[in-house]
Amino acid sequence: MTEDNVLTDGGLSAEAQAVIDEIEEKNVDFLRLQFTDILGTVKNVSIPASQAEKAFTEGIYFDGSSIDGFVRIQESDMRLEPDPSTFAILPWRKKENSAAARLICDVFNTSTGEPFSGDPRGVLKRAIERAEDMGYDINAAPEPEFFLFEEDEDGSATTITNDAGGYFDLAPKDLASDVRRDIIYGLESMGFDIEASHHEVAEGQHEINFTYDDALSTADNVATFRSVVRAIAAEHDLHATFMPKPIAKVNGSGMHTHISLFKDGENAFHDGADEFDLSETAKQFTAGILEHAPAVTAVANPTVNSYKRLVPGYEAPVYIAWSDRNRSALIRKPAARTPAASRIEARFPDPSCNPYLALAALIHAGLDGIERELDCADPVRENIYEFDEEKREEYGIETLPKDLGAAVDALEEDEVIQNALGEHVTEKFVEAKRSEFKDYLVAVSEWEIDRYLETF
C-alpha cells in the first residue's frame, strides 16, 4: 500500500484527506463530480463541499439508466467514486471568497461492487493494466485543435469565425491571442504544463499544446481541456467547438496523438542503432495500429462529420501507412531531440472522440502488434496524396473507411478492438453510431437544397 493510500483515522486515504484540507483552505463551496458517457460527453453532479468526505468514503449514487449507453431502468443504481488525484479548482468559477472544484470519478456497479464495464475511464484502465502486465508504462500527448466562432446577440453559436488568420499568424490577423492566453492561464491553474499555443491553418482555428503524461492522466486532461476551452471562450462571447470539420474546403481539426512505451524507466521505442531510431517494439506497435486502423477509426473518428476531415488535400491522413517524415501518412515518427523523446504520432484521431476509448483502442491495437510480433512495412517518404490507385496497390497501401458506416462495419469485424472496448461498450457504441449514420443518410442537407431545388 502506497503512502497516499494509507487510511487516516477518519477512514480517508492520505490523498483524499489532502483534498479535504485543500477544500477548506481555498474556500471551496461546491464540488463537481465528473465522468463521461460512452460517446465522450462530460457529465457531472454537483455536491456541497460539506459532502466531500462522504463522497470519498461512500461514493455518490446516481441513476445510470438516464445516461445514454449505461444501463437499463431495472438496474439503474450506479455509484461515483472520486479520484482524489484529479482535484482542481475551476478557474472560471473562482470568486473572491469562494470557489468551485472538480473531481473526476470512476463508475461502479452497485449490484456487484465492481467497476462498471461501461465506464470509459475503466476501459482505458484495463488497457493500461494489459500494458503493465507486459512490462510497459504508456505515455501519451494529444494535440486537440479547435475553432472559435462568433456568438449572435442571443448567445447562440454562429458559423462566423472570430478572425481571418492563418498558420502562426500574429495580430491583427490573429484576433484570439488574448483568448488563448486566458485559456492557458486557466489550464495552468488546473495543473497543465503548457508548451505552446498558436493560430492554426484555417480561419478561426487554434491549437494549445500541453506536455505528455501517463495515458490515464492524458485522457483526463483532454476531457478537462475541452471544458476549459469552451468555458473561457464563452467569457469572451465566443463559441469554441471541437467539431472536426465545421467549415468545408479548409483544414479540419485533428487530435494528433503521440504515444511511447517505457520499460524499466527506459524508452522502449528507442534504438539508436536503427535507421529511424525506432526499436523493434516500436515497429511492432506501429504495425498493430496500422492493421487495426479501420476499426480504431470508428472510435478515434466517431462522428459523421469526422469523415469530412479525412479527405486528401487538407493535411489529414487517408491512407494506412507510416513515415519517418511524411505528414500524409497515418502514423509519423517525429524527430526526437533525446532518446527519451522517441515516439510515434497517430495522425488520424480527431477531438470529437471519447479520449478514454480512443486511447484504449490505440493501446490495444499496438500491444496486439507486439504480442504477435507483426512485421512493420517500410516507411513511405513520398506524398501519398499524389499516388494513383495503381501506385498505392504497388506499395500495399489501404485506405481508411470512407464514412462512419464503413468504420463501424470494420469495428464489428475486429475482435481485438471489440475486446479492447469490452462487450457492453462495443454493443452500445455500435448501436448509437448505427443510429447516427442512419439519421445522416435520410437527412436533407443545405447543399442538396442549393443544388437541386430549382434544378428539377
Swiss-Prot record:
Q: Which UniProt keywords apply?
A: ATP-binding, Cytoplasm, Ligase, Magnesium, Metal-binding, Nucleotide-binding
Annotated GS catalytic domain residues = 120-456
The UniProt catalytic activity note for this protein reads: L-glutamate + NH4(+) + ATP = L-glutamine + ADP + phosphate + H(+)
The UniProt record lists the EC number as: 6.3.1.2
Residues annotated for Mg(2+) 2 binding in this entry: 145, 200, 207
BP-aspect Gene Ontology terms: glutamine biosynthetic process
Which purpose does this protein serve, as stated in its record? Probably involved in nitrogen metabolism via ammonium assimilation. Catalyzes the ATP-dependent biosynthesis of glutamine from glutamate and ammonia.
Q: Which NCBIfam families match?
A: GlnA
Identification of the protein by name? Glutamine synthetase 3
- Look up and give the organism this protein is from: Haloferax mediterranei (strain ATCC 33500 / DSM 1411 / JCM 8866 / NBRC 14739 / NCIMB 2177 / R-4)
